[in-house]
Amino acid sequence: MPVITLPDGSQRSFDHAVSVAEVAASIGAGLAKATVAGKVDGKLVDACDLISNDATLQIITPKDEEGLEIIRHSCAHLVGHAVKQLYPTAKMVIGPVIDEGFYYDIAYERPFTPEDMAAIEKRMMELIEKDYDVVKKMTPRAEVIDVFKARGEDYKLRLVEDMPDEQAMGLYYHEEYVDMCRGPHVPNTRFLKAFKLTKLSGAYWRGDAKNEQLQRVYGTAWADKKQLAAYIQRIEEAEKRDHRKIGKQLDLFHLQEEAPGMVFWHANGWTVYQVLEQYMRGVQRENGYQEIKTPQVVDRILWERSGHWSNYAENMFTTSSESRDYAVKPMNCPCHVQVFNQGLKSYRDLPLRLAEFGACHRNEPSGALHGIMRVRGFVQDDAHIFCTEDQVKKEAADFIKLTLDVYKDFGFSDIAMKLSTRPAKRVGSEELWDRAETALADALNESGLEWEYQPGEGAFYGPKIEFTLRDCLGRNWQCGTLQYDPNLPERLDASYIAEDNSRVRPVMLHRAILGSFERFIGMLIEHYAGVFPAWLAPTQAVIMNITDKQADFALEVEKSLNGSGFRAKSDLRNEKIGFKIREHTLLKVPYLLVIGDREVETQTVAVRTREGADLGSMPVAQFVELLTQAVSRRGRQESE
């Protein structure tokens, strides 16, 4: 007779094995109707699954994050149902949940078209309206093989082969369609009404370009139509903010086929890049970092010693010269250890903070490249702190404070911090892991901000802190990291002389704040929709004359502003002033200065903002003060 304990501590007793759905019904009809699945003793199960022994139970509904994931997973199965009805010769592969949606990979004789996607979506809606139950059957392995053989589902059979230890598998039936899954899934299609298919793409079986190409159908699903509409609106806004589109409009950069994953920076974009670099250079100098520069191409011997050659070679660009093999560096850390190793180091030299704006290259798959967000050639704001174990906590705490201050300067204040702890497969003693994790946790606590653990997500050699930024559209971007590493100093024989004259390995803290300049600039473009704060804008002010008579004064103002360290340009074209204002507003220049006869006479400028605000006429010195304040504020609000 199972006793079921609910989240509020109340208990319900039953005189027989009871399903999650039955427990929900015993509580109330409304909850029974909303039940998607259950969590029994912390494990997700289907609503139809039986509970035979005493257990804790949480009823999962569409309001729960797990419920939303289950809805999305079931929508992927619904894609399979619709596709098999419309295209009976299609072979179904896999259909997992992804962030805010799902996809299904399908093998078919031709690429799907937008018309196909519309037809699949229409059929899915028709199937949902049938309001049928999704039936789960735990099925012996041999029978599962027979089911998929009879249906000619070759890929499903290959997936069964990948699980030799599974003696029984869950089959989920959508009427005549059957799919294999660990589950759980929704009990009825009524939960799937708030969905939309979003795009088509190609994919490879098992993600390997050497394998056959598949069709990938993407979609999203939500708890209700209101959430779906909000998501669609957010996606439409994201498309307007696409950094590739804005990059072209503002003449920031371009990419071309002859250099896949490599950025051609134009003057405007390179200006933004240089502002970032100069800002980070100043920040690091103020915080005790020494800037260095290391080679781009390094002999494979170093990569073998560091372990990268055996674990990362397929992502490295390589070349040969005079019977020696070289690699273009995919990361800076082994080279930084070489700088540390030059000359004897004492405990008095630590902590030693080495920073580099290091150009790295990684041979990313062409299908993974995305604008300047995912590239093959990039520059990191990379640094490595060599320190004693006792110094780790302070160095981590200082880095956390520095990182959060930098993000505020770029207009990001919603930051999630996570501590990734020891994975199952790891090196080093438990005592070392305890000390490392405690030092990083204590540093996070000193920040006074909320943070969370990511159990088991650390590297095999040490824990790490991750910083995730939330942009104006609510999207999360993982940027900064602080990685504890006692492993690379060991591999590359780094040491210092301790107070007792013994040789000791330093702890190496890998750290980055922006991540890569390219990706961070892409984020900034989309976060601001190209409307950069004044300190980042490629052109901060444009001076426009009304007639040729004001040209000389316009040039004087331009010279004065540039001489004061600002980025100003004159537009002396023989065009109507309204045309000029509109053009530079579209180019998102923060300040538009108009000069007519009255301004020449009074030696002033009429100031407008790109938002259309008329700030009136003022002396150039007053405008310089206004612009100085705007630039010094960086991306922070006036109240910060």
From Swiss-Prot:
Pfam families: HGTP_anticodon, TGS, tRNA-synt_2b, tRNA_SAD. It is found in: Cytoplasm. It is an enzyme of class 6 (ligase). Its EC number is 6.1.1.3. GO terms for molecular function: ATP binding; metal ion binding; threonine-tRNA ligase activity; tRNA binding. Zn(2+) binds at C333, H384, H510. GO terms for biological process: threonyl-tRNA aminoacylation. Keywords: Aminoacyl-tRNA synthetase, ATP-binding, Cytoplasm, Ligase, Metal-binding, Nucleotide-binding, Protein biosynthesis, RNA-binding, tRNA-binding, Zinc. Binds 1 zinc ion per subunit. Homodimer. PANTHER family: THREONINE--TRNA LIGASE, CHLOROPLASTIC_MITOCHONDRIAL 2, THREONINE-TRNA LIGASE. This is Threonine--tRNA ligase. It comes from Pseudomonas putida (strain ATCC 47054 / DSM 6125 / CFBP 8728 / NCIMB 11950 / KT2440).
